Amino acid sequence: MAGTAVVASGNYDLEIDTGFVQDAFLLDDAVAGLLDNTQYVLDGTTDFASVLDGVNSISVRRGRRDQGDQFSAGTMSFTMLDTAGIFNPFDENSPYYDTAEAQPGLAPMRRVRLSRYSSLNVKEYLFVGVIVNYDYNFALGGLDTVTVFCADDFYLLAQTYLDEFNVSEELSSARVTAVLDLPEVAFPALTRDIATGTQTLGGSAAFVVPQGTNVLGYLSDVNEAEQGRLFMSRDGDLVFDARLGTTLTPSVADFHDDGTNIPYNGVGITFEADQVTNRAVVQILGSNNPQVADDAGSQAKYFVQTYSITTSLLHSDSAALDLAVYLLDPEPEARYTSLATSFALLSSAQRDTVAVIDVGDTITIEKSFTSGVTTTELAQELAVEGIEHTINVNTGHSVTYYTSP
């Protein structure tokens, strides 16, 4: 089995792009110069170095906690024990030091990827992004450690700004593609997964994108008009989903607390007034005519709770009114908001299923409730909005999913 074993969880790999070939045959080298070895080959095959054997903990956060939140950059952090000093950026003898360029191979903005191998030895990515910062901690009289902070490619979009952009009236998905194709953005075409949008965006003078507009901020505005999802997938693709409806995709995993299906060890439940929206106001760019949707019955019970969008990219007042109606959520609903499980509780097949659940997937959560002598079970199918992984080489892998109806 490839990768490094993590207790009661499976085999994993954590790879960092060093900027130079890591497995090339080197003449006269005591390790890389051995004839007929299979690890170091002529010309080499990869710039990525596996560092998991020096890591003691990894934390990944992706997506959002609630459907009403905006998606931000996914993050990963991990801590390495530098017992041999090879992660020291000043060590020119480190195997990760690029002697040809006279610079550390482990450096900010290098590519990084975390993966897990299934029981069939299939490599599945859990996070793909770039390194943002190395925090090296020199411990006098103890072990040096390096904490590495990473972000997915939303971080790159958040650091990029547009030139003035004259837009055309087009579907939201076409606008996303047009922005990503701009020369100042140049987002790779092969790492996009863009569904056809349902909403038309404006193309008049009022919708011209001014110079200096942040790319991620503008794409978030596009998604606000569409009311879909815009996020980076676990394998590094930019995903744009169309407006979310009332029908979910088939469930990819069933979590139960009664000893059947996939077990879990934590569930969040909410039933609160903050869920209510009984007045929605949407105003498009260039219009002085805000579109308002009200639910008088809900306002009588829960007071007026307003959701307002004042600079919508939608093309017409009619579309703005449709969005205002869509945003109404007049009655609070008791629902499961999160679910946590530990891989130590799961079978090998269940671990394979749970590891690859991604934002936008549907899961089923069933919980047993006891009242007196009666036990009832309540199951809900919910969409995954956010994911948190915690991996510790000594205690294993645990995961939390944040959900929406």
What name fits each language-model region?
Residues 1-170, 206-227, 232, 260-269, ...:
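Assembly/oligomerization scaffold segments
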Residues 2-53, 169, 177, 217-394, ...:
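Acidic, small/polar-enriched beta strand-loop surface segments
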Residues 70-72, 166-171, 183-188, 401-405:
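Low-complexity, flexible helical/coil segments
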Residues 98-103, 198-206, 242-245:
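Surface-exposed intrinsically disordered loops and tails
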Residues 158, 176-210:
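N-terminal export/assembly leaders
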